[in-house]
Curated annotation (Swiss-Prot):
Pfam families: ATP-synt_DE, ATP-synt_DE_N. It comes from Neisseria meningitidis serogroup B (strain ATCC BAA-335 / MC58). Coiled coil: none annotated. Transmembrane segments: none annotated. It comes from the Bacteria. It is a peripheral membrane protein. Keywords: ATP synthesis, Cell inner membrane, Cell membrane, CF(1), Hydrogen ion transport, Ion transport, Membrane, Transport. The lineage of its organism: Bacteria, Pseudomonadati, Pseudomonadota, Betaproteobacteria, Neisseriales. Produces ATP from ADP in the presence of a proton gradient across the membrane. GO terms for cellular component: plasma membrane; proton-transporting ATP synthase complex. This is ATP synthase epsilon chain. InterPro entries: ATP_F1_dsu/esu_C_sf, ATP_synth_F1_dsu/esu, ATP_synth_F1_dsu/esu_N, ATP_synth_F1_esu_C, ATPsynth_dsu/esu_N. F-type ATPases have 2 components, CF(1) - the catalytic core - and CF(0) - the membrane proton channel. CF(1) has five subunits: alpha(3), beta(3), gamma(1), delta(1), epsilon(1). CF(0) has three main subunits: a, b and c.
Length: 140
């Protein structure tokens, strides 16, 4: 079984560092599935669920990413995410409330800094909601 090293890092912390046999990353071109020895590429990440297949794990490791940059090398994948949250740390009610607050913040922003912050919070909330929807639709 071929493996690759995967690093998922947000501006606040390292979210995942370890091996994987497969990873799915939400990119601006669509979901990108990556196996070990993939051709080198770079892409922009869009809000959504990043999914990792990890050796020895029965379930996928899920991380909500709000955007960022993906770099793929034959033996290593790096995701530099604006905001990233492990699925175990997510709560639907909090994510929905954050989405509503961010939407209100966008409409009430008085300057570019406030608008950018509201967009960042909105992207993070959307990513969490998409990840929670993925979990719900794939429960067995």
């Amino acid at each position: 079984m071929s493996i690759m090293q995967v690093e998922v890092v947000s501006s606040e912390q390292k979210i995942y560092s370890g091996e994987a046999t497969f990873i799915v990353v939400p990119t601006v071109q669509g979901e990108l599935g990556i196996y070990p020895r993939h051709e080198p590429i770079m892409s922009l990440v869009r809000p959504g669920a990043l999914r990792l297949t990890v050796p020895g794990e029965d379930k996928e490791v899920l991380v909500a990413v709000s955007g960022g940059v993906l770099e793929v090398q034959p033996d290593k994948v790096t995701v530099l995410a604006d905001v990233a949250v492990r699925s175990a740390e997510m709560d639907r009610a909090r994510a929905e409330e954050a989405k509503k607050a961010a939407e209100a913040g966008i409409s009430q922003a008085k300057d570019d800094k406030a608008l950018a912050e509201a967009h960042k919070v909105l992207a993070a909330a959307i990513a969490q909601l998409k990840t929670l929807d993925y979990i719900r639709s794939h429960k067995k």
